[in-house]
Amino acid sequence: MSINIRDPLIVSRVVGDVLDPFNRSITLKVTYGQREVTNGLDLRPSQVQNKPRVEIGGEDLRNFYTLVMVDPDVPSPSNPHLREYLHWLVTDIPATTGTTFGNEIVCYENPSPTAGIHRVVFILFRQLGRQTVYAPGWRQNFNTREFAEIYNLGLPVAAVFYNCQRESGCGGRRL
């Protein structure tokens, strides 16, 4: 990643908290309904209830990718002791396709933050080939860097994040 201090992934500390610097080399398009995720986009939990549509660029169907979706701000940005929370894990996604053609290792769980503004990050890795990946025992305290090292994925080839916070009018005092 050519270091650009204005890059939203750096400004938001996604690079640092979740990822090491990397060079974007493939297109990653994540869409909830009609809303395409761009870095720093604000989405409400009600807008991310359903699994997003994910499209991956590339030119060679023989290349495979792994998509990781995490929230590094669980349970709250000021006390992220469960960092990172794994929301979704899909492997063996052929280039030029999307997650529907991959192998869902951990099913999609929609973000539902209870305190503060959470960053929800989609990270795409290029695989060396098809491989067997095991689901982690739990979603909390997932470590993207460690996962990439275990499965020899190297640095990411793309990433995008959105911000999500509790819906206003949820919870509170009841009489």
Swiss-Prot record:
<dbReference type="GO" id="GO:0009908">
    <property type="term" value="P:flower development"/>
</dbReference>
<dbReference type="GO" id="GO:0009911">
    <property type="term" value="P:positive regulation of flower development"/>
</dbReference>
<dbReference type="GO" id="GO:0005634">
    <property type="term" value="C:nucleus"/>
</dbReference>
<keyword id="KW-0256">Endoplasmic reticulum</keyword>
<dbReference type="GO" id="GO:0005783">
    <property type="term" value="C:endoplasmic reticulum"/>
</dbReference>
<keyword id="KW-0963">Cytoplasm</keyword>
<dbReference type="InterPro" id="IPR035810">
    <property type="entry name" value="PEBP_euk"/>
</dbReference>
<comment type="similarity">
    <text>Belongs to the phosphatidylethanolamine-binding protein family.</text>
</comment>
<dbReference type="GO" id="GO:0010022">
    <property type="term" value="P:meristem determinacy"/>
</dbReference>
<keyword id="KW-0221">Differentiation</keyword>
<protein>
    <recommendedName>
        <fullName>Protein FLOWERING LOCUS T</fullName>
    </recommendedName>
</protein>
<keyword id="KW-0539">Nucleus</keyword>
<keyword id="KW-0217">Developmental protein</keyword>
<dbReference type="InterPro" id="IPR036610">
    <property type="entry name" value="PEBP-like_sf"/>
</dbReference>
<dbReference type="GO" id="GO:0005737">
    <property type="term" value="C:cytoplasm"/>
</dbReference>
<dbReference type="InterPro" id="IPR001858">
    <property type="entry name" value="Phosphatidylethanolamine-bd_CS"/>
</dbReference>
<keyword id="KW-0287">Flowering</keyword>
<dbReference type="GO" id="GO:0008429">
    <property type="term" value="F:phosphatidylethanolamine binding"/>
</dbReference>
<dbReference type="InterPro" id="IPR008914">
    <property type="entry name" value="PEBP"/>
</dbReference>
<comment type="function">
    <text>Component of the mobile flower-promoting signal (floral stimulus or florigen). Promotes the transition from vegetative growth to flowering. Required for 'SEPALLATA3' (SEP3) and 'FRUITFULL' (FUL) accumulation in mature rosette leaves. Seems to acts in parallel with 'LEAFY' to induce flowering by regulating 'APETALA1'. Translated in leaves and then transported to the shoot apical meristem where it activates the transcription of several floral meristem identity genes. May play a role in both the autonomous and the long-day flowering pathways.</text>
</comment>
<dbReference type="GO" id="GO:0009909">
    <property type="term" value="P:regulation of flower development"/>
</dbReference>
<dbReference type="GO" id="GO:0030154">
    <property type="term" value="P:cell differentiation"/>
</dbReference>
<dbReference type="GO" id="GO:0010119">
    <property type="term" value="P:regulation of stomatal movement"/>
</dbReference>
<comment type="subunit">
    <text>Interacts with FD/BZIP14 and FDP/BZIP27. Interacts with FTIP1/MCTP1 in phloem companion cells. Interacts with NAKR1.</text>
</comment>
<dbReference type="GO" id="GO:0048573">
    <property type="term" value="P:photoperiodism, flowering"/>
</dbReference>
<dbReference type="Pfam" id="PF01161">
    <property type="entry name" value="PBP"/>
</dbReference>
